Design a protein with these regions (language model features):
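Conserved acidic catalytic loop of the alpha/beta-hydrolase fold
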Residues: 1-10
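Gly/Ala-rich beta-loop-alpha elbow adjacent to hydrolase catalytic centers
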Residues: 14-18, 22
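Flexible "cap/lid" loop of the alpha/beta hydrolase fold
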Residues: 27-28, 33-63
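Short beta-strand/loop motif that positions the catalytic acidic residue
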Residues: 118, 124-126
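Conserved alpha/beta-hydrolase "acid-adjacent" motif
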Residues: 131-137
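Catalytic histidine-centered segment of alpha/beta-hydrolase-like enzymes
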Residues: 156-168
Length: 175
């Protein structure tokens, strides 16, 4: 962004971990972009989740590489069936250490106070059927960010908006 775009861009979007990364960027650079789209980003740390990740993935990591298990996991994410092959390839490409590291970091992410100084117009998207931690995070972000708009998406689960409803997502981008 600094080298190729003079230090700021029109819009940045992020889903889940990508949303956390975007929020971290905005907390460090209040004028990084004019608009931001944050979907399903958790900003409430969970020590319990953090402590369970290493033993859970330590014992079942090899299962993730099994296609039958990966299909079960994929179905639980409620993604379009035609995305499975990409999902499977991407998942198999992540090392055990990296998967544990990014899941643990994500589970402990918290909103920085400096995020409140962000000047971007931020659109927060969260599925109505997401877990409580994600829903509370969206509300907390909305309360903190003066120029934010909270969109609670009826009947949607985690990540469904940008992954399964790309047409609606693009309409929001263009709005």
């Amino acid at each position: 962004i600094d080298r190729n775009f003079g230090g700021s861009v029109l819009l940045i979007g992020g889903l889940s971990l990508g949303g956390q990364i975007l929020l971290e960027m905005l907390s460090r650079r209040k004028d990084l972009c004019r608009f931001a789209m944050v979907e399903s980003a958790a900003v409430i740390p969970s020590k319990l989740t953090y402590s369970l990740i290493k033993p859970a993935f330590g014992s079942c990591y090899e299962l993730i590489r099994q296609k039958w298990f990966s299909k079960l996991q994929f179905r639980s994410l409620r993604m379009k069936p035609e995305l499975f092959n990409d999902y499977y390839q991407d998942t198999c490409g992540i090392t055990k250490q990296n998967m544990i590291a990014f899941l643990q970091e994500s589970s402990m992410y918290f909103m920085k106070k400096s995020l409140g100084e962000c000047v971007a117009e931020i659109h927060l998207f969260v599925g109505e059927r997401e877990n409580k931690r994600i829903l509370f995070s969206a509300r907390k972000l909305h309360e903190t960010l003066e120029k934010s708009n909270l969109h609670i998406l009826p009947t949607m689960y985690h990540g469904e908006f940008s992954i399964n409803h790309t047409d609606l997502y693009v309409k929001e981008l263009c709005a």
